[in-house]
């Protein structure tokens, strides 16, 4: 029974991924989320920029939490990844962190709450592909000698 549910969820997730592709981001990254806001009869897209402090859930229930400081107050918002309210996510900068959940940022203010920028902005898959290509070139060079 659960396999059927997982299969249906995977199909729905793939269908949504076709329409809009989200970047590969993780906690510590600064993201700009395009959110569809309905005010009365009008709908518009509003940008919500902040630090992703957590990702949780799996499948269609996956969500991420974004924290920003607005007029001196910390504001956190949880976005479901596959929600129609989320128009898109733009990766502003990658952060260098060693935790999956950055809830400790809630207690920090000012410079203490800053996250260092990651120097290598490539994703893990891109780094591994480059490493494999370098190893292949090295093997070809050794075979030629």
From Swiss-Prot:
Pfam families: Ribosomal_L19. PROSITE patterns: RIBOSOMAL_L19. Keywords: Ribonucleoprotein, Ribosomal protein. GO terms for biological process: translation. GO terms for molecular function: structural constituent of ribosome. GO terms for cellular component: cytosolic large ribosomal subunit. It comes from the Bacteria. InterPro entries: Ribosomal_bL19, Ribosomal_bL19_CS, Ribosomal_bL19_sf, Translation_prot_SH3-like_sf. Belongs to the bacterial ribosomal protein bL19 family. This protein is located at the 30S-50S ribosomal subunit interface and may play a role in the structure and function of the aminoacyl-tRNA binding site. PANTHER family: LARGE RIBOSOMAL SUBUNIT PROTEIN BL19M, RIBOSOMAL PROTEIN L19. This is Large ribosomal subunit protein bL19. It comes from Brucella anthropi (strain ATCC 49188 / DSM 6882 / CCUG 24695 / JCM 21032 / LMG 3331 / NBRC 15819 / NCTC 12168 / Alc 37) (Ochrobactrum anthropi). The gene is rplS.
């Amino acid at each position: 029974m659960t396999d059927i549910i997982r299969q249906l969820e995977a199909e729905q997730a793939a269908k949504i991924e076709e329409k809009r592709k989200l970047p590969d981001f993780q906690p510590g990254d600064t993201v700009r989320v395009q959110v569809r806001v309905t005010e009365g009869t009008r709908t518009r897209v509003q940008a919500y920029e902040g630090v992703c402090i957590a990702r949780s859930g799996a499948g269609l229930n996956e969500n991420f939490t974004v924290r920003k400081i607005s007029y001196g107050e910390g504001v956190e918002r949880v976005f479901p990844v596959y929600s129609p309210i989320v128009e898109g996510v733009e990766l502003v900068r990658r952060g260098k962190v060693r935790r999956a959940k950055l809830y400790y940022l809630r207690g920090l203010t000012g410079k203490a709450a800053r996250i260092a920028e990651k120097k290598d902005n490539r994703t893990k898959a891109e780094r591994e592909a480059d490493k494999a290509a370098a190893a292949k070139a090295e093997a070809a060079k050794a075979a030629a000698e």
